[in-house]
């Protein structure tokens, strides 16, 4: 009734009205592997998980994140998706090729590592969305053909400049893996 996940001992269900959120034991006690020392560390995140669940079941209008598709975008990493869910943000996909306008309920448009450039029409729609107060989150890297000219042109309107280069973390065990 509450979840499709496998229910374990010491798991919780938070319910209010028509909404419910299942909190698995693994969400309360989080285990992380350290590949350098071949050890595991366990931390308690019960407060965060329960607070998030209460917020979810009591909030009527959850923020809407639209993930752009249609340009060979990569899938969002699992830990990124989990964090979005924990923050009670609903995700949807959006192809600007099939719509005349960006949905009004879109709080944020996420552009995640496109492998091909956006069309001028798509950039115009995103520009109008941003000018009307919409939020854009762009995560782009190198592409096969080497350029995202239209996308980067959109970002330049807001003071974002791109340059070629490589970012290197000198201490390899302190980086975040996405």
Where are these regions (language model features)?
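Short, surface-exposed patches at the edges or C-terminal ends of soluble domains, predominantly
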Residues: 1-176
């Amino acid at each position: 009734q509450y979840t499709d996940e496998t229910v374990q001992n010491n798991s919780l269900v938070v319910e209010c009205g028509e909404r419910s959120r299942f909190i698995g034991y693994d969400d309360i006690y989080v285990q992380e592997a350290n590949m350098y020392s071949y050890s595991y560390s366990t931390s308690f995140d019960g407060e965060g998980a329960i607070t998030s669940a209460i917020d979810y079941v009591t909030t009527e209008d959850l923020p809407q994140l639209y993930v752009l598709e249609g340009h060979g975008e990569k899938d969002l990493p699992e830990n990124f998706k989990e964090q979005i869910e924990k923050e009670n943000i609903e995700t949807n996909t959006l192809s600007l090729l099939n719509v005349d306008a960006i949905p009004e309920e879109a709080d944020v448009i996420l552009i995640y590592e496109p492998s091909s450039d956006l069309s001028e029409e798509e950039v115009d729609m995103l520009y109008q969305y941003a000018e009307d107060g919409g939020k854009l989150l762009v995560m782009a890297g190198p592409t096969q053909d080497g350029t995202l000219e239209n996308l980067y042109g959109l970002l330049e309107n807001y003071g974002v400049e791109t340059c070629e280069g490589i970012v290197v973390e000198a201490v390899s065990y302190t980086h975040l893996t996405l």
